[in-house]
Amino acid sequence: MANKSINGDSYQLKDILATELSAYYQIPTYQRPYQWTEENCEKLLDDLLSSYECYKESDYFCGSLVLIAIDTDSKTNAKTYDVVDGQQRLSTFILLAKVLVTLYDKDLNKTSREFLEKSLGDTDEEKRKRLDFNTIGSNAKKDFQNALDFLDDLNASNGKDSTRVKNNYLKNAICLKNYLEKKEIADINDFIKWLYFKIIFIKTTCSNISII
């Protein structure tokens, strides 16, 4: 018999990240640290660009995202989720959104900019962040924000040697930026549209961690 406390469905990236006043994510205390390497990031971009160029009309399945709904906003009905599985990919896609909105700032159309900016957080007055951290005794929240802030100044990040960086979020943000700077994407808005409509996650929501 199926467990009614578990629900898994396919979601486009736009419905995972570009969710203003709808969905927010939190890395809970029991989660392991962010461990993706530059090699992981480069492989992800290799795969994404290859799929975009060769299999543009096909969906790109990006694995599972297992969540626990922990709060519902009484005013907006927005839900906050603990990320049980998938935090490595989720965090990296948010870093990628920051790299894209910074690197291609002058080339973005309105729709692309909205997708990218809403992936980082709400664009209303409160500007609630899409991803937060409930990691007591960890520097994860500070490290993640430092990586986002660092990309605001592309001149400062130029030539940055990521091998000397201890912050994994920052190291990978630099890796993503350096990779994309070397690539020629003919139509960046078309690529961003593909990212948000063709990248698919299997999102599973649970009522509590004990049933996972």
Question: Can you describe what each PLM-predicted range is?
Answer:
Residues 1-212:
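Glycine- and hydrophobic-rich flexible loops that cap the catalytic core of alpha/beta enzyme folds
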